Amino acid sequence: GFPAQEDGAASLSGGNSGNIIVPVNGGGDFLLMAHMDTPRSIKGVKPQLLADRITSDGTTILGVDDRGGISVILWALRQAVEQKKAIKPCTLLFSVCEETTLAGSMFYQPSAQMTHGFVFDSHLSPGKFVSETCGAIAFKMKVKGRASHAGVAPEKGVNAIQIAAEGMRNFPFGRIDACTTANIGIIGGGTATNVVPDTVELEGEIRTDYLDQGEQMMQAVIADFEAAAIRLNGSVECAWHWDFKPYRVSPDNTPYKRMEALCRHLSLEMEGVKSMGGSDANNMNAKGLPTINLGVGAQYPHGTDEFILYDDLQMSADMALALLTEI
């Protein structure tokens, strides 16, 4: 076997497990990665083995996002050992909290000898991979007014909902251009219909390919809310951060070149695509490790109709085996 260790990512994520790290033959210069958490509970999952695919029974998700990725990496390692194939020095990383905060990959620090990585976590079919993504800013606003009786003394109150509505007047909801979106998805406040609400809290995001553009948009949003608060005699607090930063792995980067060779070796049609979603690959690229997210073929992830085709699962496993031993 190979030694496995657990790091301290649980301290960052607030979970009960850290990342599992498996250095293979010294750890090598590349990473194979998948995440251990699932987007929703898989308690009571009952996998159904159909003629061409694996599904759940429809009452839970299947959890192939990303148990599929874990399975193909472990299968490939086992096959390499059993077939007595020479295994390239590399590191296997099984991360935590990918679905919520990417906290596991945020905590992990690649060694100095690492040059590139592969994440097995995309819903795309094998041969396709995510070579570039947007980044996402997450923000929280707390709008403060002053409570008062809405019928007896409304003049003494400052309505936080009114301030929030004014602040959102110019918010660019939806798709702004081909690589930029914005949304406020959570809002809440007030205690009763006869009380002028003194607090409203809301949460949103901005997704974009460009760091500068994202931060400029965020500052414009803050300015709109602050202007509304000043005009209506309230105040606003804002906290924001990059949930994940954008990346682009170009064709001259090592993982892209290895993917080209891999697809030729397995007679697969290769396609690098752009995604508006994030993955552990975003954090690896942000740490200076060129990393692409490979298609495993998990269809309808996050839903109770999630499934994976046997052919896609086997091809993904063959890809992992080739990366470990040949390509």
Please place each PLM-identified region on the residue numbering.
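Active-site metal-coordination/substrate-binding segment of hydrolases
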Residues: 6, 13-94, 111-114, 315
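Glycine/charged-rich beta-loop-alpha catalytic/anionic-binding loops adjacent to active sites
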Residues: 49-61, 142-148, 266, 298-302
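A short glycine-threonine-serine/GTX helix/turn-capping micro-motif
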Residues: 127-130, 148-155, 191, 246
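Metal-dependent amide/peptide-bond hydrolase catalytic core
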Residues: 142, 159-327
